[in-house]
């Protein structure tokens, strides 16, 4: 019997902060399981989850507004430690008898807080000392409102000149509030504070580790599917690859992977996927060459969203046809990860907007009554990668830059043609190869090449040529919500440009995209 890795668990209530998922990832990094729920949960749901502790996230609302979100009152009656972050601290203060006011000055960015009273949350944690020996902490603030009176049974733990209650605590009830964000790296001791809360105050053991997660996933897959057969759409991306490896470990030859080669992959990618999973790891793979079918469906279509939908639809059609050829398949596996689950929940509550549609195996034939196996649905992307390493997948594959589901279909601007894809594949391979050679690949968050359907005059030897243009794109980002264009060295860009123009017959000009996000998106389509 595998160990219960969910035994100790933290509940994070989401009040809408852009950093909330980061809080959850930090708790997981400490080896403790946690879940992220909307703030308006019921007492019954909290009782059922039975958390070892509760974290109240930050949020964009103002607690001074009449209908702003509040923590369920049961949070403060459950008898477990509670940690309020930013908005979470303000709603805690207000709900327990303190007072919050809108401030004239918004405090955003670096601040230094002075610890004025002892507390289990920050005992022995400091960045510097004042002249009279008081601990100082370097933190990241982001708030407009501030607590002006703490509840009567709380003490002030730390303050700044403009924020008299930067940390408050009720040690007896183990309630803590901080007016800054411990989850961001700018708060230098933030991880130690979270560790103090999760591991010491909530007394959670570090049971959530890659090896134990794998054992748990394998046991759950076996329990769910037994001796039944399972089908998986394998793309070669991180999520489907790790899903394939987990299922292979759990059920061996009862897994069939369908690899649809849509003609929109990177250079030699199809061969690499088949070699690695088929020849090296011994998975049972059905290879479906479908380039002509995808390109025919895309012919004449210029609209990016329409292209995404076509690629998604044709993939489902091809996958369904292959699934129908297999006998006795009872289960469909998918590489759904935890942020997908959170996104779906947000959509259900009307709190998320779709900027670009994502495609997955969306529909299965009505006659196929299949169950769903989603072994990664509790995991964040960084956890999926760590598990992949533990399962023996190569680092370069797990940590390569994101590649869109529709592939080159949205990196060829406008109509997608085989000629354009072939040129783009070769140009992109040169860019990535040079990034790796210059030790720049891991210093940027994402880099790729875009095919522009415009011709430009060039000179080759004594002759003129009139060929296509490609754009190089490289960005630096923490969360992909915002991004800066990467300041790559000019001599490096010159080398890449020369190689592409000289080695890829059909491209006459290379440009570099210097747009940030916002206003531009990272992908061009």
Swiss-Prot record:
Inhibited by 2-fluoroinosine 5'-monophosphate (F-IMP) and by N(2)-hydroxyguanosine 5'-monophosphate (N(2)-OH-GMP). Disulfide bonds: none annotated. One of its GO terms (cellular component) is cytosol. PROSITE patterns: GATASE_TYPE_1 (PS51273), GMPS_ATP_PPASE (PS51553). It catalyses: XMP + L-glutamine + ATP + H2O = GMP + L-glutamate + AMP + diphosphate + 2 H(+). Induction: Activated by cAMP receptor protein (CRP). Repressed by DnaA. Pathway: Purine metabolism; GMP biosynthesis; GMP from XMP (L-Gln route): step 1/1. Residues 9-207 form the Glutamine amidotransferase type-1 domain. It holds the Pfam family GATase. Its EC number is 6.3.5.2. Residues 208-400 form the GMPS ATP-PPase domain. CDD domains: GATase1_GMP_Synthase (cd01742), GMP_synthase_C (cd01997). GO terms for biological process: GMP biosynthetic process. InterPro entries: Class_I_gatase-like, GATASE, GMP_synth_C, GMP_synth_GATase, GMP_synthase, GMPS_ATP_PPase_dom, NAD/GMP_synthase, Rossmann-like_a/b/a_fold. Keywords: ATP-binding, Glutamine amidotransferase, GMP biosynthesis, Ligase, Nucleotide-binding, Purine biosynthesis. GO terms for molecular function: ATP binding; GMP synthase (glutamine-hydrolyzing) activity; GMP synthase activity; identical protein binding. The active site is at residues 86, 181, 183. Catalyzes the synthesis of GMP from XMP. NCBIfam families: guaA_Cterm (TIGR00884), guaA_Nterm (TIGR00888), PRK00074.1 (NF000848). PANTHER family: GMP SYNTHASE [GLUTAMINE-HYDROLYZING], GMP SYNTHASE-RELATED. This is GMP synthase [glutamine-hydrolyzing].
